[in-house]
């Protein structure tokens, strides 16, 4: 018979412990940090030495209008690796290249100046596996 590991809740996340391994389970419903933005929010969860972000933006959201002024920038300079969960958005570069990000797509955006905005009338939600620590902070 397999022993059931001890389970307890600590500061909004669950910890499972056995004699060989500790597993930490967290949810975005109880993030470690929330960055409230005009027309959106960026939730951060820190886990296993990494920070994962969840971006949720309303229709009409645009980085240069709703994030840029609060961080003192006209374009985002953060490198991103992520996954689009729902909705559509663009990544637009100053040289005229524009890429659409759609639900189910993994994306990489290099750390060169770019703008982004929600496309259509549905909210946009994505996970960010790289760049979350620096997103929507001064000098991003």
Set out the residue ranges of the language-model regions.
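A short, N-terminal "cap"/entry segment at the start of jelly-roll beta-barrel domains
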Residues: 1-56, 64
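Glyoxalase I/VOC metalloenzyme domain signal
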Residues: 2, 59-61, 130-140
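Short, charged/polar surface micro-motifs in flexible loops or helix N-caps
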Residues: 50, 58-64, 88-89, 132
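Glycine- and acidic-residue-biased ligand/ion/polar-headgroup-sensing regions
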Residues: 50, 70-95
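Conserved short histidine dyad/triad with adjacent acidic residue
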Residues: 54-75
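Short acidic-glycine-tyrosine-enriched beta hairpin
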Residues: 95-112
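Ligand-binding loop in jelly-roll beta-barrel domains
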Residues: 110-136
């Amino acid at each position: 018979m397999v022993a059931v590991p001890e389970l307890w809740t600590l500061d909004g996340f669950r910890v499972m412990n056995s004699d060989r391994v500790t597993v930490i389970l967290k949810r975005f419903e109880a993030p470690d940090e929330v960055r409230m933005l005009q027309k959106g929010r960026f939730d951060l969860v820190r886990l296993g030495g990494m920070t994962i972000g969840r971006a949720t933006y309303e229709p009409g959201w645009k980085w240069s209008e709703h994030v840029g002024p609060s961080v003192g920038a006209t374009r985002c300079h953060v490198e991103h690796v992520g996954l689009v969960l729902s909705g559509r958005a663009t990544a637009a570069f100053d040289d005229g290249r524009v890429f659409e990000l759609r639900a189910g797509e993994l994306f990489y955006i290099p750390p060169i100046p770019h703008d982004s905005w929600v496309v259509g009338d549905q909210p946009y939600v994505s996970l960010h596996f790289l760049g979350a620590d620096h997103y929507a902070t001064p000098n991003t």
